[in-house]
Each structure stands twice: as structure tokens, then as C-alpha cells.
């Protein structure tokens, strides 16, 4: 089956399930056999259902096997091989819904009810976007959100991500994303339309299967992390799940970049390509075709081609010669600080809130104004420590408590 198409692999797995069902194998065992075979297929390895005990076992696998030492040697060898492979992928192994319930500190019955009713446990609201349209947020209720955080911390956070992914991960930011594209003759920016809504529950289910989890576990995890058939914008699990779904997209685009000599990175739904060869823009139709094949649509009105003769910005960072903040943004911050020192701070807070759509501008709290302004200055410091340091020095002289 090595090198087989996705359709051929799924036919093989379907036949594998059918053979075991006809042999009256327990459904839970069929799930594990399919999951183990899928791990081989995902790595283009020959499928081996009698692997023997691995030579080396990680401590968590040893502990698990010790607790289940009563099972037959054949079953023990199979579970040892399966659990070790999952652990080597940087993931926690989950054999069945009861195992998942234990990890999430829920009873199996409670887990089942929570998964079945998950769609009803969200509340929706809208927030304004920069272009004037509204973004709909689907936020989980406290109980579901706490379970999603456990899924994030115990299952998703350890899964390997693409090196091209710059958003929603530790030690990466809009600054590290911008640094990858400094000093290039051409920078191309593409934006994916309806990023989270286009990642359907079917894709999430397929992701959990590809990670090696049994169908019963993958189904529960999908129900707990999707809403109305897609990734919800307000769930804590959605950002990491989007990165995991995009691993193949990232791998394909970065692979083209290696061959065609351009840099590629992705920050959430913002895709950036840069090169010293201005002719790389001729690849745009092909790149958009790859993106479409991976189930996404490019928001064409937001496509930007930036050449070295003008300002080049990547996720808000100017990248012409070195990472920097746009002069206009620095001038605005200087003006706000100056006006606060010379005039009415509360008036400045109201104007600041109104210009950014931050609720009722007349009642915008000074504490929120101070925190927001300080956050913007700290952002400048991360990109340009010298300029940011001067802004911070001036900021500290504002008489907020006067």
C-alpha cells in the first residue's frame, strides 16, 4: 500500500474493518486495528498487524502495560506497538471512549452527553472587522470550554506542527513571521476566505483519524471541538486544530518554495511568499490551485504584491530592510503621548476608543486606555527596541493618576 492514493487507502481500511466484522471481532478491537493500520499508511509503511513488542518502550507505555499485564501476550504486543507509535508522534494514546473520559476527568456517560449536545452549548455574538463587516464568534459555555482546554493541553499541544506555521504557537509571532521575508525584492500576500468556517467537522474527524486515534475516540473529539459542522471561532482548540489541518497545505507550498527559490510562511489565514526573483509572481495561479486543492478559497481582493520600491508589510511588520513598525503608526503613538502630557487625558482616551471601535468611547476607562497604549508601545519595542524604548520613556511621564 506504500504510495497508494487516499481513495485506495480508505478502501483498504474499509475492507479491513469488514473482514474483522465478519469474523465477529469486538467493535473496540476493530477500531484499534484500523487505527494501527492507518498509522502505517500515513507513513507509507507496509501494514503490519502483528508487530511484536517494540525494543524500547517509553515510560508512559510501560506504566500502561504494567496496569494491563493480565492480557494475552499477543494483545499486549499489539497494544505496546500501537501506544509506542502514538507516543513517538508526541501524542497521548487513547484506546477507547472510556480512556478519553478518564483523561478529561468525566464519566463515560457525561462525556457522551456533552459530545451529543455540544452544538447547543455555544453562544454567538459579532465583533467588527477592520473592513467594516462583522465577524461572528461562537463561544463555548464554561463547561465545554474547560473540556476543550483539557483537550488542548493534553492532546493537541504536543502534536507536531509545520515549520511554516507562525501563528497560534509558542515562541512564534507576527514578528517572527515578518523576519522570514526581510529584504526580498517581492512579497506576495494571500488571505484565505472564511478560514475557520471552511474547516469542516469532516476534516477535523479525518485529522484525528490521521493522528492515529480509533474512530470512536476521533468522533467524540470532533463533536467536542466543532460547532454546526465547522471550527468555532471562539473555542480554545480551534487555532491549534487549524494549524494541524493545514500541515499538508504548508508542506506542499513550502516544498514548491524550495524548488522555486521563494520563502513561504502562514500566520493563521495570512499566507506570505517572498523572493529575490520578481518573476515568482507568475506562480500565483499555481499556488492558488494548490490552496484550492487543500479545501480553501483565496480572498482575491485582499491579494497584495509588494515590491522593494515601496513599503512591504507582513502581518503588520515592515520588512523592507529589517523588521520595523510603519512610520505612520509610530507618529500616531507619539502624538497620543504628547497630547496626553499636554492636554486632557480623558479626551484622548475617548478619541482613541472611537478610532478603534472600542465600545462606548465616552465611557472608555482610563485603565483600559493605559493598558492598550502600553501594549502597542511594547509591540514597537519587540520590533524596534530603540524607538520603542523612547516611546516607553515618554509614556511613563503621562500623569494618569493626576
Language-model-derived ranges and their functions:
Residues 189-193, 234, 238, 257-276:
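Catalytic palm active-site di-aspartate
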Residues 213, 262, 295-296:
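Short aromatic/hydrophobic-glycine micro-motifs
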Residues 1-127, 134-136, 140-160, 165-186, ...:
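Right-hand nucleic-acid polymerase module
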Residues 213-221:
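Acidic/histidine metal-binding catalytic segments
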